[in-house]
């Protein structure tokens, strides 16, 4: 016999999620504290008094006293259990009507395919069977969308699995980029609220560079304080004075080498020496410019990671564009993933990538040997006669905002 219960004990809730293959951060009991501008209901589904599914519902207020239910990366249930699925949908419809919700939107962890880049992709035929079962229960599937902006959550993500991650498993060019950054004086440290100001600074730099609007410092602080023992900031930085001393030593060595040149010295060797000198003098000028402005230690790149169960999520990342030539992003993301695995994670999700698997996101994230995971996408479950009118307006608004 199936039953449901509202506001399940948080400990019972999270323990269930942490042991479920679909368990994820967005369904955790504390996620509603992050999305506190929305309403929230947590409903647990029981079979013979045993918890068999959960749905962390975010409730978006709409005009005229209406609302919309949204269940990010949920509900978390066994979708192959048709009786359970039917009960969950009927329960959600009942709750939605009580809240005057026009529809229930959800995007569960159901994969169409998975695969490492360059290897054969594994298709999941069961997912499409589940889609057909949902359709039989009057749920609308938005389909295999082609544009990232068409979905709330990414339909494709780059997720590193622990067994596929080590320095040796990365490409030669990625390993070289990490070595080069370290040789240029880049250092990395981990922290929390103590690094918040520097991380926020980097995010503002990223906003300016990409001409986009991201989150503010208060939001990042909320993430860190809501998950105090399961969050961390990775920060790469450069000690300008130390780097200046090192480059000046290299220049001194370069000049001494040049003094030994004779008429018999090969032209190529002289040319290489001159090019190196130009590069070193240029970097010295660059560093002194920042030191003269009062800078000493400069943040270069940062990430903010939240952990839940055996998963970790690289939610936000920023970089100081003015120091791009130090190549800080690659070592920062590498250290973030490595630190996550050292802390017990089995997967490290780097977030969404382009649906057509072409572009800057996948080009960068593919450097870390991730598994590319394709989700089934979004479903809409109408719970009001106003659904079709609302959904049309919703799609138009989303299309306009993506321009």
Feature map (PLM): residue ranges:
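C-terminal catalytic domain of photolyase/cryptochrome flavoproteins
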Residues: 33, 291-292, 352, 356-403
